[in-house]
């Protein structure tokens, strides 16, 4: 008998990719995610390639994964893809410490983030 197949979590003309455990704060990651939101994928790749932000290479990798998912898994046309959503969230925070004066201990928080990118196939009007 077996289980039923899980329904798609996105529309018929969409695909997505997730990147987890990115070693940056969500606030810094959102700056780069806002850079590509709503753009055609060719323009988004160009913007991320020449961005000076350190995390932009990880965002580029996630975007290329979403494009590959759209092409290989869902049969979408790569030339008509647009970044419909790019959002980030908070992941775990690695806690470290630094000795301070008078026997105290200063907390150092090293945040991690996660990123989700959805691409959508649109017509020639985009």
Swiss-Prot record:
GO annotation, cellular component aspect: cytosolic large ribosomal subunit
Keyword ATP-binding: no
Family annotation (Gene3D superfamilies): Ribosomal protein L22/L17 (3.90.470.10)
Record's keyword terms, sorted: Ribonucleoprotein, Ribosomal protein, RNA-binding, rRNA-binding
Known partners and oligomeric status: Part of the 50S ribosomal subunit.
Biological role: This protein binds specifically to 23S rRNA; its binding is stimulated by other ribosomal proteins, e.g. L4, L17, and L20. It is important during the early stages of 50S assembly. It makes multiple contacts with different domains of the 23S rRNA in the assembled 50S subunit and ribosome.
Protein name per Swiss-Prot or TrEMBL: Large ribosomal subunit protein uL22
Organism from which the protein derives: Cereibacter sphaeroides (strain ATCC 17025 / ATH 2.4.3) (Rhodobacter sphaeroides)
